[in-house]
Amino acid sequence: MPGVPDNAAGLRAANARLRELLAERDAEIAVLREQNSEIAVLREALAALQSQVADLAAQVKKNSRNSSRPPSSDGLAKPAPKSLRGKSGRKPGRPKGQPGVTMELTDHPDKKVRHRPAKCGCCGKSLKGAEVTAVERRQVIDIPQVRAKITEHQMLTLLCGCGCETKAAAPDGVTAPVQYGPRLMGTGIYLWHGQFLSRDRACRALSEMFGRAPSPGALAAAARKAAGLLAPALKAITEYLVSAEVVHFDETGFRTAGKLAWVHSASWGKFVLVTVHAKRGKDGMTAAGILPFFRGIAVHDAWKPYDTFENVAGHALCGAHVLRELVAVTETGTDLDRAWAQQAIDALLALDKAAEDARAAGGTAISPDLLAEHEGWYRKAAETGIALNAGRTGKLQEKRHALAKRMKDREDDYLRYARDLRVPFTNNAAEQAIRMSKLRIKISGCMRSMTGAEEFCAIRSYLATAARHGIGALDALTSAFQGRPWIPETG
């Protein structure tokens, strides 16, 4: 048979050759297996790198509009403004028919200065004694130079006919041979804790404006005194908030004595209370004195320690926070992710508008059919988000899954504003209440001691509440230093 060896030697040679071929094949198979193993490792590494790149890209895209970052972190390249509410149809500028704010001439100026031309503009003759035919009025609003005045109180000692000497009592608050008065000290505290100048700069400003100024140490002592004088006002604010039906709560970092402390805020309507504590969580919230005794609806973000207060009637989660999270999904997710996130955004905003319209019309509830429709869209969006990100491969999917699951699990809290018109859609009021503490840090740096931070928060609570009641900060502080702090009515 052709090709078949005709002897044993030929068979052995062919067999040896086959063994060589089999060995080569086994070696190639081993190499391929090793390569497959390496490819699998490389694929895993590539997937991990792709996930990291996606996470980093999402981080780069984060700004104050789609995350919890403050607007100050946007830098010079601020994101283009976008309104989730869509176009209102209103043109920019002052609405037609609305009165303007042009300064008007007053009929009762404090001072009048008449300017007469000396000679005729045509023939050059003197105009002395000439008849006045017209008057053009122009007014300049300015402030006169203000210098501190020194008032000396002399307590006389009088001798009675019976031989007894009686000395007059000093006026209230006049306790030292030389001291600064309530308006000067009130102005100093206003510049320091009202306008956030540093303590030294506040003293320099007083000196330059009024010719007199306390030392930085004396101003610090005045702040300590003011915080003590404000105790009755702070007590009234606390009592009002504890008994309120709805209260906003928030917290933010506040660098103090080289460490991170936390400012906690509670506010509703015209009342604001800010406190400071070393802890952000339940300890700090408890020390503020509102949440442990509160029986109303607490409006806040999804920070878990708020949920540990079971004495409250209910929780309402901030709509602005969840909108920012959903906007981030629309900007970084897949087409399917964008769809469910946008659906949730539309449902939340539609319910917010319906709630606003109902309040404006004097109603107490949204139309049941409208409420049910948008609740359904919201619910379906959350369920879709959970299903699409069930694999949770990578941080982005984990975040989207967590967001959708939270929306589903806490539907009652996210939609409470639509079911109870007393509840606002956002927690912006609480953020506004603590914004001044961040502004203070930006302008004049951190607080040097926890005691100083506590004094700052006490004064800010007083000033913020006074401002919401139409009371000027300077007047409120002056009254406090006169021993008559303004106390809000809570009835």
Please give the residue ranges for each predicted region:
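Catalytic center-proximal scaffold of phosphoryl-transfer enzymes
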Residues: P2, A23, A54, P95, ...
